[in-house]
Structure formats: structure tokens, C-alpha cells
Amino acid sequence: MKNIMVRDEVYEKLQKMKKGRESFSDVILRLIEGRKKRGIEILERYAGSLSDSELEKIVMEERRKFRVRSFDS
């Protein structure tokens, strides 16, 4: 088990998202898994109906939306 720190506003939002006796870890995992499923659903919806160049364009647009946070050592 690991400890993480989040801003107060993030804590409050996670607290509101909890269902029943769900832990914060459960909430975060649910959010992550939901995001993965949406990505898979999008790919399945377009599978076979787009040309390779159209699919590549969509993939590149989605990659640009993805933010990576860098950490100073």
C-alpha cells in the first residue's frame, strides 16, 4: 500500500464520487477502468469503417489530448 497526496479540491471531488463503503482506491480504479473502456469502445465503433489514414488521424488527436506529468528528481 502507498500513500499519495492530493489537493483539497481533488479530495473533495473523490469523496463525492465514493459509492457506499467504497475506498478512495476503489474510486480511482473505477475511474481508470472506465476511461480504458471508453477508449476501447471508440476503437470498436470505428473498426473496419475507417481508412488507415483516418484512423491514424484519430489516434494522433487522442494522443495530443493525453497529458503526461513530469516529476523532478
From Swiss-Prot:
Annotated keywords: Toxin-antitoxin system
Pfam family, one: VAPB_antitox
InterPro entries: Put_antitoxin (IPR003847)
Keyword Glycosyltransferase included in the entry's annotation: no
Keyword Lyase part of the UniProt annotation: no
Family: Belongs to the UPF0330 family.
Function summary: Possibly the antitoxin component of a type II toxin-antitoxin (TA) system. Its cognate toxin is VapC16 (Potential).
Protein name stated in the entry: Putative antitoxin VapB16
Organism lineage string: Archaea, Methanobacteriati, Methanobacteriota, Archaeoglobi, Archaeoglobales
Gene of this entry: vapB16
